[in-house]
Amino acid sequence: MRCFKAIVAYDGAYFLGYAKQPNKLGVQDKIESALNALGIKSGVIAAGRTDKGVHANNQALSFHAPKHWNAAKLFHYLAPKLAPHIVLKKLEEKNFHARFDAQKRAYRYLLTKNLKTPFLAPYIACGDYGSLDALNIALKQFIGKHDFSMFKKEGGATTNPNRIIFNALAYKTFIMGHECVVFKIIGDAFLRSSVRLIIQACVQYSLEKITLAEIQAQIHNLKATIRTPIMANGLYLHRVYY
């Protein structure tokens, strides 16, 4: 058997998350079904599991295939079976583990105050976010190593809640005629819905609905003020570093 590394982009609006689902509507279901149709019976490991509605620009995967498959041949046959909602961007033979070998994961979140067309609703979140300066003040609180037990949703199998945030910032840009705030968060790994809970906390602080002290208390596991993640549709797994 040969081990392959794949880089894929997918539209999270068409799936119930990355992981397998009972109704077969997970990204993993689609990819494994496509491989199965080619006679490749392999589980697919991802660098990170995205929630329902969350997109990926460069999700990294690892899987095995029989030795008669090479990267060029497999790309030729696999890519059409994944389209249109999953795009196979790169495929190479590489002995690695997509999850355990990953060093950093980078996420982006797109948020606009005024969405001018419903056709972008699955891809850009819409809502007030206050001031850019306040967002960056809040984001700085998360940089470093922390126990993120109070910044995760229930259901994850992780036993170690400690994670490192290397960089967290927000900046403004224009995307398809919309002024957006882009949140950029890079960490070694993230707990379930942690990125969306972090962004929600920053937005609520910027809107003066919570204080910086309340964010710090939640980071230190003293009291959870933010329990509901921000909407999923603006979030993208942007890049995985190895």
UniProtKB/Swiss-Prot annotation:
InterPro entries: PsdUridine_synth_cat_dom_sf, PsdUridine_synth_TruA, PsdUridine_synth_TruA_a/b_dom, PsdUridine_synth_TruA_C, TruA/RsuA/RluB/E/F_N. Its EC number is 5.4.99.12. It catalyses: uridine(38/39/40) in tRNA = pseudouridine(38/39/40) in tRNA. Keywords: Isomerase, tRNA processing. It is an enzyme of class 5 (isomerase). Gene3D superfamilies: Pseudouridine synthase I, catalytic domain, C-terminal subdomain, Pseudouridine synthase I, catalytic domain, N-terminal subdomain. Substrate binds at Y107. The keyword Membrane does not apply. SUPFAM superfamilies: Pseudouridine synthase. One of its GO terms (biological process) is tRNA pseudouridine synthesis. The active site is at D51 (nucleophile). GO terms for molecular function: RNA binding; tRNA pseudouridine(38-40) synthase activity. HAMAP family: TruA (MF_00171). Homodimer. NCBIfam families: hisT_truA (TIGR00071). Formation of pseudouridine at positions 38, 39 and 40 in the anticodon stem and loop of transfer RNAs. Belongs to the tRNA pseudouridine synthase TruA family. This is tRNA pseudouridine synthase A. The gene is truA.
